[in-house]
Amino acid sequence: MTQQDFRTKVGNTVFGVRATALILQNRKLLVTKDKGKYYTIGGAIQVNESTEDAVVREVKEELGVKAQAGQLAFVVENRFEQDGVSYHNIEFHYLVDLLEDAPLTMQEDEKRQLCEWIDIAKLEGINLVPAFLKIALPDWDGQLRHIHLEE
């Protein structure tokens, strides 16, 4: 049975709920690069799926490895425009532990993308999406933060 993503479109605005993995090792963040931008691993949660289960599923789908959801670090209300479409996402950013070695490529639908480890002190120098992570992640104090973004 195909699962339905927790996403809907009204007019020119897409509303969705996402879960993303903040995979950190030795103060480096695992990201993937596409079209000059860097992204964390993650995606839409499915209807009736917890955000913790969603982030573990997304890591398995995209990286092909088992993972365990850790602490929820950020809840983000993210509004932005991309390719002429408005988006309003509620995002759950979890610290995630990989239970297997991280690959250096990921699978996004039919496309393979390279992954790389970026030192969190150097995030400011890359085009990271969402951009708030450049400052919020290196300065994170272990407490859940609620962030409002309009990019």
Regions found by a protein language model. Give the residues of each.
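Acidic, metal-coordinating catalytic segment for phosphate/diphosphate chemistry
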Residues: 1-20
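Acidic/histidine-enriched, glycine/proline-rich intrinsically disordered or flexible terminal extensions
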Residues: 5, 139-151
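A generic structural micro-feature
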Residues: 11-15, 84-90, 107-112
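Conserved Nudix-box catalytic region and its N-terminal flanking loop in Nudix hydrolases
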Residues: 25-61
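A short coil-to-beta-strand element that immediately follows conserved catalytic motifs
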Residues: 66-75
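Active-site-adjacent beta-strand/loop module that shapes the phosphate/pyrophosphate-binding cleft
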Residues: 80-104
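NUDIX/MutT-family hydrolases
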Residues: 106-139
